[in-house]
Amino acid sequence: MSKYDSHLKCSFCGKSQEQVRKLIAGPGVYICDECVDLCNEILDEELLDTSGAAAQPAPKSEPPQKRRARSSNLSLSQIPKPREIKKYLDEHVIGQDEAKKVLSVAVYNHYKRLAILQSKGSGKNGDDAVELQKSNILLIGPTGCGKTLLAQTLAKILDVPFAVADATTLTEAGYVGEDVENILLRLLQVADLDVEEAQRGIIYIDEIDKIARKSENPSITRDVSGEGVQQALLKMLEGTVANVPPQGGRKHPYQDCIQIDTSNILFICGGAFVGLEKVVDQRGGKKSIGFVQPGEGQSKEKRAADVLRHLEPDDLVKFGMIPEFIGRVPMVAVVDPLDEEALMAILTQPRSALVKQYQKLLKMDNVQLDFKPDALKAIAQEAYRRKTGARALRGIVEELMLDVMYELPSRKDVTRCTVTREMVEKRSTAELLVHPSSLPKPESA
């Protein structure tokens, strides 16, 4: 074996011989055992299609729920109503009624589109003249206000595949980074590589504002992670047949790709769009003739959200989004910033609230954990000052409970912990861990 053999790679997926079980050599090319298996699967699928797939049994490796989803017919009685979807979102996300309504209606209509397409395929629907077009959604709001959580919560209740992608990793084709087709690969993986299921799915693209072009005017240099990505997303948002590399990464000419039709995939985009309210305000006028005047006691964040409710497509263009992209995301919902009251509710009210999580953790050590109302208020006030939304809550509680979580598993004499405002402000929980015998005894009558 020559000294160069250790650098041999599969000509199809690019994996080295150390990463695979077997590497087979041909005239100037190499193929690994994984790619051979993939080719066999593709040939088997084509054989099933030509010989009548309906008469063949489902593969043993296919989950039963996927077989049911593909064989079952969607009907209006099976589709969750917008009120039902919003009610479920209310159990997990505090506030944001407008965004919840927009998402609930969009998801409900997405289900109805799928039901109509299914009935057309079976020949049951005679009204073929009317075609329902999908309405992609844009969520705008500050960091930590629940945009991503809304999407993640939706994923738990939907009977269609749901994937979350990050726009910050995307670049234009041919440059270092991920191609936009990798977004579809995530959806395909959620659907267990079932193309038919993936084509009915929903994709949430987070941090979409990070692909805004760097300036409003065209530049002589290429903006490969901004306008270039927006251009690459256009056809995918509208509906096209995209070639997705099964192993991810960059596409190359000799690679077998999976074709996915995005016409029936619903896209939800979310971003903070920092500074967009200033663009809207400038259009409305200066000082006294602006859209929204500061109310008494109104915070800067709340006023910014009120200003954004007057958003127009031209404002997004000035921010850095191209007109073609905006036209493919017609529904816009503004997500409100979280005030102290909302942050306090987030600590206790959702089904998986932060306080409930810590109570469950300590209960496993036979310790009852309680937070006094003024302690919860102090945590919410500090989180509000940090300006990072609900994400700050976990950091504060983690700092507060570190010593308690460290000591309690080794202590059998502590059965109850009550957190007070003073403990939150001083970041000291030492008195929670004091041995009962060292506490001053009450005077006898």
Swiss-Prot record:
Keywords: ATP-binding, Chaperone, Metal-binding, Nucleotide-binding, Zinc. The keyword Thylakoid does not apply. Zn(2+) binds at residues 10, 13, 32, 35. GO terms for cellular component: HslUV protease complex. PROSITE patterns: CLPX_ZB. Component of the ClpX-ClpP complex. Forms a hexameric ring that, in the presence of ATP, binds to fourteen ClpP subunits assembled into a disk-like structure with a central cavity, resembling the structure of eukaryotic proteasomes. This is ATP-dependent Clp protease ATP-binding subunit ClpX. It comes from Nostoc sp. (strain PCC 7120 / SAG 25.82 / UTEX 2576). The gene is clpX.
